[in-house]
């Protein structure tokens, strides 16, 4: 990696370590990665194990209204493919891939290039980081290495959020079952 890439990594890691919440860390990550890599989109999908879905939790470049609302089953789309394989998926024409899944809410149909990297912690997928470009291109090995390094840092942040019970991002009041309450004894 070049000195510039190392400086960028250091800056991102320092800001993430100084953040006060998982959501803030994810937003820092997508904004800095999009800027550093000069990509049109950077998104992070976190795995909701209970529902077997990847939920879009942060994005720079996709429709902001889709964040926190769009999800894919673990067997769906290119994000699901990255998670199933537990390895990088690098495509120069993503919409032509058999696993591409069009999600109109995100506006991602205009992006051709796709690089998805699994966020792994102790050999377990916790999410997927994705960068996309309108222009068709294969992302370089340096770009892959940059994202793998950032995903290693991100996995620790997510694992910490799990450990301290700060990852209840998947439980919204509408998703919780109705509990019956009883008055009295």
Feature roles, as predicted:
Residues 64-65, 92-113, 133:
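Signal-transducing coupling segments at domain and membrane junctions
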Residues 1-24, 35, 126, 160-185:
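Signal-transmission linkers at sensory-effector interfaces
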Residues 148-156:
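Allosteric cytosolic regulatory segments
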Residues 128-137:
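Short beta-strand-to-loop transition segments that serve as allosteric relay/switch motifs
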Residues 119-129:
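Short hydrophobic/glycine-rich mini-motifs in sensory/regulatory modules
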Residues 55, 64-99:
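Regulatory sensory and allosteric helical modules in signal-transduction proteins
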Residues 31, 43-67:
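GAF sensory/regulatory domain recognition
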Residues 112-120:
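A short, aliphatic-rich beta-strand micro-motif
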């Amino acid at each position: 990696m070049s000195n510039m890439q190392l400086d960028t990594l250091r800056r991102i890691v320092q800001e993430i370590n100084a953040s006060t919440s998982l959501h803030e860390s994810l937003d820092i990550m997508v904004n800095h990665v999009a800027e550093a890599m000069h990509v049109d989109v950077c998104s992070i999908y976190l795995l909701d194990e209970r529902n077997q879905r990847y939920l879009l939790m942060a994005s720079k470049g996709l429709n902001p209204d889709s964040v926190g609302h769009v999800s894919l089953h673990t067997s769906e789309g290119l994000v699901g493919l990255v998670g199933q394989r537990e390895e990088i998926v690098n495509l120069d024409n993503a919409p032509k891939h058999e696993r591409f899944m069009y999600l109109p809410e995100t506006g991602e149909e205009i992006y051709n290039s796709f690089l998805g990297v699994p966020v792994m912690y102790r050999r377990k997928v916790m999410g997927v980081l994705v960068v996309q470009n309108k222009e068709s291109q294969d992302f370089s090995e340096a770009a892959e290495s940059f994202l793998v390094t950032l995903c290693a840092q991100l996995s620790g942040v997510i694992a910490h959020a799990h450990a301290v019970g700060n990852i209840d991002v998947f439980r919204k009041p509408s998703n919780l079952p109705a509990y019956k309450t009883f008055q009295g004894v």
